[in-house]
Amino acid sequence: MFAPRVFLSMIGALAAFAVATYYLNGSLASTAIQTLICAVLIQVGYFIAVLFLVWKEARERRRLSSQKQFMTAEAANDEKQPGKVSLRRLNRPHHLNS
């Protein structure tokens, strides 16, 4: 969500809302109040959308971090077990079987 585009779109939507409200009510005071309420609701929606995007990104980073830790721990366990040969060590370029 590109902020300047969102704000310009918000201003356009509020202007259209204000024109329609004034056309329906004919009252400038009522139009101003209803447009202000609409602006607050749009801002709350934008704030919730940004919070959702941040939450989603944080959740994805935590998931990737936990997978990375699991893979690192698994590789460390492969290296430490005495009877088990790690495929990672066999695939090294300086290994004699190459």
From Swiss-Prot:
Annotated Gene Ontology cellular component terms? plasma membrane
Membrane topology recorded in Swiss-Prot or TrEMBL: Multi-pass membrane protein
Q: In which pathway does it act?
A: Glycan metabolism; exopolysaccharide biosynthesis
Q: Where is the composition biased (Basic residues)?
A: 86-98
Q: Which residues cross the membrane?
A: 6-26, 35-55
Q: Which InterPro entries does the annotation name?
A: SyrA
Q: Which UniProt keywords apply?
A: Cell membrane, Exopolysaccharide synthesis, Membrane, Nodulation, Plasmid, Transmembrane, Transmembrane helix
Say which domain of life the source belongs to: Bacteria
Function recorded in the entry = Inhibition of exopolysaccharide synthesis (EPS) and nodulation ability (NOD).
**What protein is this chain from?**
Exopolysaccharide production repressor protein
